[in-house]
């Protein structure tokens, strides 16, 4: 028998907690026998003293096991179950292409995604811009669509990792969000409850990333890889660039359009292509669907070229209540803003730096994201035709096209975009799309 306050005291005094102590505390969180004040004190003790890797694994497993853990064995899938998770960014629409691409190569991708958080866009918000798309199907439909389309992207139900929900809500109001141990357990408890064989993490680096520095992003990637593998799920991570908007668009319906155009080959942003291919290739290799990255890229290019990846996306959308012609007639099913006008820089030159976070907040400011959880989203607004770092701007080349509801909103967004992008006379050095991979042997 343990007491919550004694477990808190031990962590406060920088002692290493046992697996049994952590299990007891998290079970209490799930059963409401541990108070909000005790959760806050525990989170702050961890914040100041951190956790060892075995403690992080125990915390992740306890939070994963606090609710339902999906078992797919009865579905008799004829391929591996694989997923990816991104720490979030702006114009980060990779999930919408990556799920169908991996599915078309023989994987099964039951992806449980989140809403937008702060300046970052949420995959669920993007999908909800498609009329009829059901992000909260019952488990039977989730399984059925995953089996038939190879991919299903849905929201987190209350019975998956419920302890995390309570812990996260408390961390959010007690200044304990930015802690590697707690972030690791929060991300992985939800992901591992989805019953995955393997996972690829996309950890963002740069001005639009969740973590403030490259070193912090790398530390998080290593923590996630070590803990997930320690918890029994084969996991690798890629550190990818978020010093500029990843896609050509930022905004919900705009990003869905771009994802569909990417899958059909109508238009592929080169940076988005590099990141999507790198993540997909890693997913195929880790799931034993390809022997190496080169073979994986050949398979992925084939399913883009022959239309199988686009077909998987269409099947998923239709299976989850959306239209059956989203690929062919996407404009009929996605909202369009009333005002679509370019914004120009005040001077000519090279795009030197971009505050990607501020660009994300410009989209939120137009109603494309939530300031508080109860806000409703305007799916049509956002940015498109985004300029990239190193490109030249002048009176003919705009920084972006702004999609707004009215003139006032357009002007506010235009001011924000201009303030977020620095123009200089010298061309900056190019940054890579993918900085490095972190595999289990690296941690």
Curated annotation (Swiss-Prot):
SMART domains: PYNP_C (SM00941). It comes from the Bacteria. Keywords: Glycosyltransferase, Transferase. Pathway: Pyrimidine metabolism; dTMP biosynthesis via salvage pathway; dTMP from thymine: step 1/2. GO terms for cellular component: cytosol. Pfam families: Glycos_trans_3N, Glycos_transf_3, PYNP_C. One of its GO terms (molecular function) is thymidine phosphorylase activity. InterPro entries: Glycosyl_Trfase_fam3, Glycosyl_Trfase_fam3_N_dom, Glycosyl_Trfase_fam3_N_dom_sf, Nuc_phospho_transferase, PYNP-like_C_sf, PYNP_C, Pyrmidine_PPas_bac/euk, Pyrmidine_PPase_CS. One of its GO terms (biological process) is thymidine metabolic process. It is an enzyme of class 2 (transferase). PROSITE patterns: THYMID_PHOSPHORYLASE. It catalyses: thymidine + phosphate = 2-deoxy-alpha-D-ribose 1-phosphate + thymine. Its EC number is 2.4.2.4. Homodimer. Belongs to the thymidine/pyrimidine-nucleoside phosphorylase family. The enzymes which catalyze the reversible phosphorolysis of pyrimidine nucleosides are involved in the degradation of these compounds and in their utilization as carbon and energy sources, or in the rescue of pyrimidine bases for nucleotide synthesis. HAMAP family: Thymid_phosp. This is Thymidine phosphorylase.
